[in-house]
Structures are given as structure tokens and as C-alpha cells.
């Protein structure tokens, strides 16, 4: 075998491994996290109790695709979703792994065909932190809704799974952990991911398996904030606000009320500490 053929073979194998790694898996632990007595989940409950978890995940996806009356602060009506030229640029560059992270560093950096979430082209803490806010993902969802082009949904699901795999909560790389799981970034993802959910949930790329990956990951984010609230200041207020949103957008979780109640309690306490008599 010539060196050229060997390089082609190795490249093909690496591409296949990456594709497999980005394939969502059925996360059966989701059935321990949701409240089967929530209205509308009767079929999900029956299928799970019958040992049909794949079918239960499909039923759960059907439930979410048909769910009414729950929206986000930024997306009230999916039929009115728009995208600016700047947002479209972020979405299109995101397809090529050129990620808009920070206005202070333009043009945006490319993070490689096999995304390197640890890439730190300029040693500015904000550049590394804000990478994990995924600012180009909501624009990808807007682009999907406006253009109906599945390439945005397909790429978003791949990047979402890739991030989960490469940035685990129990990451032994402690330096990476302090960027990827800093509470402010975690709360920012809590805020934005319901928008992504609304924008992408009807896509064929949003499979039942992906749904379970998404929900388990989202649950982990909320629990992380609950255990790691900032001590004071604006970070704490952001986190509390976003925990309220998490519980309200996903009331199907057993812990949803705990999340929302924690946020309400903090805001009620902090308004007396952070706002003086003169306003």
C-alpha cells in the first residue's frame, strides 16, 4: 500500500469514527427524570412500563412536537421568526465550524473539521468562556426556520452531540472544565437552548434519540446551577432568572418546580439586598 493510499484510508476511518461519535444514542435515564403523571405523557408512561423505551422516546417526541402554550421570551410565534444578515452570516459560517464567539475578535476563528473546543487562539479568558455560549446555534435555528434547509438542523445536532462528548461534566481536564462548565456559561445555555428546541424540534434530524440526549443534558445543566449558584451579584441574578425559565419551559421534569422555586427565592431575596430605598 502506498503512502498516499494509507493517508486516504486513515482519513476515511477518522471521518467514520467522528460520524459515529456524533450519532445520538437513546438515553434511557431520561425516563427517571420526567414526571409520567404530567398531562399528555400517558402513552410515554405506558410504553416505558412495557419495556418499549425506543417507542416511548418516539412518543415523547410526538408529545413535544404537539405541545401548545409554552414559548420563550424571545420566540412567541414560530411563524414570525426572522433572521438578520449578520445572524445569517453566523449561521452559515457555523456550518463550516467558523464560530462567532466575540465581537472583539473578528473575523471569527475556525475551530477545525473535527471541532476543537479547547482551541484558544488569543489568550483572552472571555474568548474561551464565550465559545461555550454557542452564539451561532440560535441563528442556525433561525436560518432553518426561514429557509427550511435541513443542513442547518443536521449540523446543529452534530455539533450539539460533539460538544456533549468533548465537554463532559466530569471532565478530567480541569482547565477545560472551568471554561465549559462555569456557572455563567451554563446558565446562558439554559436560557438559549429552549429557543433552539422550538426552532429545531420539527426537523427530521431531531430524532427521538437526539431528544433524549438533549433533555438529559439540559437536566444536567439545571442541576449544576442548583448546586453551584454564584454567591452574589449580577451572575447570581442571571442564573436565578434562567432557572425559573428552565422550570417553566420543561415542566415535564420532576425537578422543574424545584428549579423555578429556587430562582424565585433568590430574586425575592436579592431585590432587598441589591436595590436600595431610592431605587
Where do the PLM segments sit?
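Bacterial Sec-dependent N-terminal signal peptides
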Residues: 1-23
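Basic side chains
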Residues: 4-5, 27, 76, 133-135, ...
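Short alpha-helical hairpin
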Residues: 99-117, 131
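Aromatic-lined, polymer-binding surfaces characteristic
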Residues: 109-111, 123-279
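Extreme N-terminal leader/anchor segments
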Residues: 22-102
